Amino acid sequence: MNKRVHVSPTQLAWLPFDTPTDGDVDFISGLKSIAGSGDPTLREGLAVHTYLCNASMNKRAAVNSDGDFLIVPQLGALDIQTEFGPMYVQPGEICVIQRGQRFRVKVEGPTRGYILEIWGSQFQLPELGPLGANGLANARDFLHPVAKYEIEQESWEIVYKLAGKFFVSKQEH
C-alpha cells in the first residue's frame, strides 16, 4: 500500500461553491475545472467542471470543440439555446451538449451545477438490457430540443473551448 495515499472509510465530498455576488458572471465566465484525466487533443479522457453564474449570456455564445458536456444543475434552472432549439433544464435533470454545438445559457438568478466533459466518445442512450421496456432508460424519458430560430442582424461574441483553452471571436448573426 502506498503510504502517501490517504484512505478513508467515510464518505468524502466538497461543499457547494458560492455563487458570484460581485458583478455579472455568465455561464462561460463562471466555468471552473475541478479535476481531469487524459488530454483533449488526443481525444481521450474526461474533465469535471463546476459552473457558477448569476447573469445570462447576452449576445454571447459558446462552442466546446474538445468534447461533450453533460450538465447537472444543482441550484437554479438553465434556459439553453442551441443550434437545434431551446432546452430548459432544472435541478434534478441533466442535459447533453455535444462537441461542436453552439449554445448560449440564460439564467434567472444565482445558478450553479456540475459538468462532466468527455473527450473520446460521445454520450449515448443506454441499452434497455434484460429488463426491456421495464428498464429505467426508455427513449420517451429523454427530451430533445424543438427547432426554433431567430432572425437578427447583430454582432455576437463566440467563445471557443479548444485544447482546454478559451478563444474569442466576433460574428455577425
Residue ranges and their predicted role:
Residues 1-173:
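Jelly-roll (double-stranded beta-helix
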